[in-house]
């Protein structure tokens, strides 16, 4: 990670833009409060109590009762230290709190139903392999014997090095070669409770062969393809066509094969999984019932299973709607735990088999809440910004007739004719462009006409705001008129799921939340890619096309993208060679105070370039050779060469994102 920069970077203050009366997206409500902002951005619905809007209009982290810290204050402290943005804020207390919340939910259900077994969670590190995340989960889960799950050799090597409770599970999932299996078996000799999951039938003989060669008795689990499927975007992960797992015939063959080897007692776990982010609790109950019946069937076949692993899928309510929408979930963690415990117990009692240790592989639900991506707004563009007053004055006789027609449309818009006015404006704009292409309209008239068109749309938008019925052709008007807030980040690096699968994340300003937002906006990143934009935002009833934001002023304006701790850290791509962003690990203290315990600087430009096969000395030599040639041609002086090489070297060692001098 990068060393500290020599200069002091700051987020640039935004220019104050001139606006006509028609550019305000919402009528100003002078009684707007922090409570209104909390409702507007749905903070109580998605935050789970880990974040809140304060009475002073600040977004705060609230990792425990009585603890709170302003995110704006944390970011200001980072900037004051001379560090660069963007940055991810990590709250280990929130992460530890999520581990506790999950385990206590299952324990409460076990107590309520007098369940004779117990619960052991497993964290699949593929969700976030960052050291701070894995070590925090392992430490917070130690007293609960909360384990880890690895799906590759690299992940297994990482997991084996962690300090874990002796009873904590280390589940080895995914496809395996001999090296993977050997490493897992060596883990058992280290005292780790390693269980190797059979994902396909042919893996069984590999496991038996390596176990005999090493003289280590394996503990084996078997993944079963449930007929039941999940809900939401990952529904296809389950069912008969699932990527992983054995069918019923293969499951029974595993039992027979282990009997032949006199090793049936090595089969300790049944593993099932119906997909990530399950939105509907009914799907969970159906799947758990099928899994429990399968468990009972294996017991009847002679297996002495200890664990029933119901897999992952515990969701996160990203939009706060508490529905079966793909970005939500219609249940709580408490309900999830209670339904699993109750269903397993009901089946076991009916089939008269022992109640197993219940295992779940929850990752998203543990990690999502702990991380916030800070998005510095560096500029704003939009169809109604930077319009000069004279552009909306009465066109002169030298203006083309089409421009004068558009001005007349603007002047005469009313509730009675706004639809007709809109259609006239659309037609006039098309005519304007056609005439320009033919050379009959000047560039100045085109600029006036486009400004008038945008003013017409803005006026119509104000007229129909709050109307119960809006004509179909005007439904997207707000999106068309929206500002584009340019944010200093890469969507592909830091919000990859938004780009790849349309995932929604709550986005909220860090401060000014006791002021009513007056702009409707979409967000764009700083990559040279048209896909680098956020145009869908959470809403209680639907997906919003725009996000209400404030007019930026002289003070830097920051947005927070919340629930960022699951998958985003590990799925990001190096598009345009934008690297991993910096991260601050923050502990919240009493009295609104906080400590930045660790600051990890984001990736250097040099590191990103070297990842593509280049070497820094080679690059420096190439630039120096070109500079020497330029001196020979007389286009560069020796003094300029020194400055050029210094600047080039400084940028190689610098952050890949935009930096501004204070």
UniProtKB/Swiss-Prot annotation:
One of its GO terms (biological process) is spermidine biosynthetic process. It catalyses: L-arginine + H(+) = agmatine + CO2. Its EC number is 4.1.1.19. Its cofactor is Mg(2+); pyridoxal 5'-phosphate. Substrate binds at residues 308-318. Keywords: Decarboxylase, Lyase, Magnesium, Metal-binding, Polyamine biosynthesis, Pyridoxal phosphate, Spermidine biosynthesis. Belongs to the Orn/Lys/Arg decarboxylase class-II family. SpeA subfamily. HAMAP family: SpeA. NCBIfam families: PRK05354.1 (NF003763), speA (TIGR01273). This is Biosynthetic arginine decarboxylase. It comes from Deinococcus radiodurans (strain ATCC 13939 / DSM 20539 / JCM 16871 / CCUG 27074 / LMG 4051 / NBRC 15346 / NCIMB 9279 / VKM B-1422 / R1). The gene is speA.
